[in-house]
Regions:
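Order/disorder boundary and secretion-linked terminal/linker segments
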Residues: 1-67, 227-241
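Sequence termini and other peripheral, non-core segments
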Residues: 1-15, 117, 123, 131-135, ...
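Domain-length accessory/inserted modules outside core catalytic folds
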Residues: 4-6, 24-26, 164, 168, ...
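Acidic/polar low-complexity flexible segments
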Residues: 68-71, 77-86, 92-105, 197-241
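Extracellular/luminal beta-rich ligand-recognition
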Residues: 74-163
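Surface-exposed extracytoplasmic segments
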Residues: 152-192
Length: 241
C-alpha cells in the first residue's frame, strides 16, 4: 500500500521570500511537491519515499539550488537542512515493552537527504531533545553502525513531469522543470501488520521539503504550524502503509 502527500509552502514570510528571490508570490505558491510513502519488499521490507517536485517556470528553476547527483557523495552528512533537503519525520510506539514505551513515547526519527546523495538519520528523545547540533545519529540496535538509506537509480535524473496534477493543464505542461528522488529505509516486520524503523513503530509520518532558491529557503509540508516547525508532531499524519 502507498500513501501520497501533497505539500504546500509555508506562507508566514512568503511575501518577503518572493521579493528576495525576485519573483511573484503566486509563482512560489505554484511550486508542486508530492511525496509518496510505500511499504515495499525487495526482498526485505523497506519504507520507500518518492519526492516529486515541479517548478512553474524555467526562470524560477534557474534559481533553485538542486545539487546534481554524485555517487561519490553517498554517505552520512550533518547540517543538510541548511541546503535543499528532502526530509521525513517518523514516530510511534516502541516495539519493545510497556516500560520502554512509557519512557520513550515521545521519541521520533528525522530523515534528511540531499539530492546529491548525502543523507542523515537522527533520533530525538522528545521535542527537539537533545537540543545540541548536530543531533545524535540513528544507529542500528547493536550501536556499531549508523542506519543509512538506499537510493533508487531510476529517480536520479531531472525529467519532465508525468503527473499533470502537479502542473498546469495547458499544452506547455511538459516543459515545466521537474525533479525526482527516491530512496528507501530498511524496516522490521511486526505482528498485526505493523512495521518498525529500528525499534520505533511507524505510526505517524511527516514528509517535508526545504527548497533553497539562491540564499532563501522555502519550507514545504502537508500542514504547517506558524512559524513553520517540522518537529511539531501535532501536524503529522497517521501512517496508512
Amino acid at each position: 500500500m502507498s500513501q501520497t502527500f501533497t505539500l504546500c509552502v509555508a506562507t508566514d514570510t512568503l511575501v518577503n521570500d518572493a521579493q528576495q528571490i525576485g519573483v511573484a508570490v503566486d509563482e512560489l505558491r505554484r511550486i508542486g511537491i508530492q511525496v509518496t510513502a510505500e511499504i515495499v519488499q525487495r526482498p526485505t521490507l523497506h519504507l520507500q519515499l518518492t519526492y516529486y517536485i515541479t517548478v512553474p517556470t524555467p526562470s524560477l528553476a534557474a534559481k533553485l539550488n538542486w545539487p546534481a547527483w554524485q555517487t561519490k557523495q553517498i554517505g552520512f552528512s550533518d547540517y543538510l537542512w541548511e541546503e535543499t533537503c528532502l526530509e521525513c519525520f517518523i514516530t510511534g510506539s516502541l516495539a519493545k515493552n510497556e516500560v520502554d514505551y512509557a519512557k520513550n513515547a515521545e521519541s521520533y526519527i528525522e530523515i534528511n537527504a540531499s539530492p546529491d546523495g548525502r543523507y542523515a538519520l537522527y533520533r530525538f528523545e522528545s521535542y527537539r531533545n537533545p537540543s545540541t547540533l548536530p543531533p545524535d545519529p540513528l544507529y542500528h540496535m547493536d550501536r556499531h553502525e549508523r542506519i543509512g538509506i538506499y537510493w533508487e537509480d531510476k529517480s536520479l535524473q531531472q525529467r519532465s513531469p508525468v503527473d499533470t496534477s502537479l502542473s498546469t493543464k495547458s499544452s506547455l505542461a511538459s516543459t515545466i522543470p521537474s525533479y525526482e528522488r527516491r530512496f528507501s529505509i530498511l524496516l522490521n516486520q511486526l505482528p498485526k501488520q505493523q512495521y518498525a524503523l529500528n525499534n520505533t513503530v511507524v505510526e505517524y509520518i511527516h514528509p517535508c521539503v526545504i527548497l533553497k532558491f539562491n540564499k532563501t529557503a522555502l519550507y514545504f509540508a502537508p500542514r504547517h504550524v506558524s512559524p513553520p516547525d517540522f518537529h511539531n508532531r501535532h501536524y503529522w499524519s497517521k501512517f496508512k502503509g
